[in-house]
């Protein structure tokens, strides 16, 4: 019942409840806002327990690029890239992430504690600085994820009639946002 927002938009939709905070690439985050209590209900029925708003970085005068490579002891690998630049009245940000998590059976009971997961995120945003007080931002985020968990023999393609339990989930999310801002007074 916690509403997750990206730059004030409900970008995660009904998937927020099943989304782990570890699945949100941190490279483009400028800050995180948390609203709890009765004030959160202003964001709708999905915000009864609170709101978490992830605020992205905006282009600065100097170019910025960050590459993050991560390998876990639980057989997971991540590669993330963030780049941003402002060129006069135009700016951009680009975030990309690839994740692979091998199926992992921590307690060796024959069932995966972590599913086999492939995921990919690409998120470009364009900033148009029309004048000192007016800005237009257009962005798109596409996320693909393929998960398969359950009986380790089934996941690895060795399942028989007695080994049939598994769960598979393939999801594609595409969110396009546009934000027009006009400052009325300074």
What is each PLM-predicted segment?
Residues 11, 57, 72-74, 99-103, ...:
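Structural signature of outer-membrane beta-barrel domains
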Residues 19, 47-49, 70, 76-78, ...:
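Transmembrane beta-barrel architecture of outer-membrane proteins
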Residues 67-71, 81, 94-100, 138-144:
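Transmembrane beta-barrel strands of outer-membrane/channel proteins
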Residues 56, 84-87, 126-128, 180-184:
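Residue-level signature of outer-membrane beta-barrel architecture
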Residues 2, 9-36:
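Short acidic/polar hinge/loop motifs at secondary-structure boundaries
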Residues 2, 61-65, 77, 88-92, ...:
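Outer-envelope beta-barrel architecture signal
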Residues 38-39, 51, 56-85, 115:
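Short strand-turn segments of transmembrane beta-barrel domains in outer membranes
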Residues 101-121, 129-186:
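Flexible loop and strand-edge segments within Gram-negative outer membrane beta-barrel domains
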């Amino acid at each position: 019942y916690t509403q997750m927002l990206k730059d004030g938009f409900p970008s995660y939709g009904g998937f927020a409840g099943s989304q782990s905070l570890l699945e949100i690439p941190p490279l483009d985050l400028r800050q995180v806002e948390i609203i709890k209590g009765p004030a959160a209900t202003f964001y709708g029925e999905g915000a009864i327990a609170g709101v978490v708003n992830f605020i992205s970085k905006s282009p600065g005068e100097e170019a910025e690029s960050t590459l993050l490579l991560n390998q876990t002891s639980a057989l997971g690998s991540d590669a993330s890239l963030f780049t941003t630049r402002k060129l006069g009245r135009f700016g951009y940000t680009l975030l990309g992430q690839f994740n692979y998590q091998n199926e992992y059976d921590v307690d060796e009971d024959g069932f995966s504690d972590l599913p086999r997961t492939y995921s990919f995120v690409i998120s470009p945003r364009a900033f148009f600085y029309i004048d000192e007080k007016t800005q237009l931002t257009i962005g798109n985020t596409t996320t693909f994820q393929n998960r398969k968990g359950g009986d380790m023999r089934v996941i690895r393609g060795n399942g028989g009639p007695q080994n049939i339990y598994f769960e598979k989930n393939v999801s594609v999310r595409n969110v396009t946002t546009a934000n027009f801002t006009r400052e009325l007074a300074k």
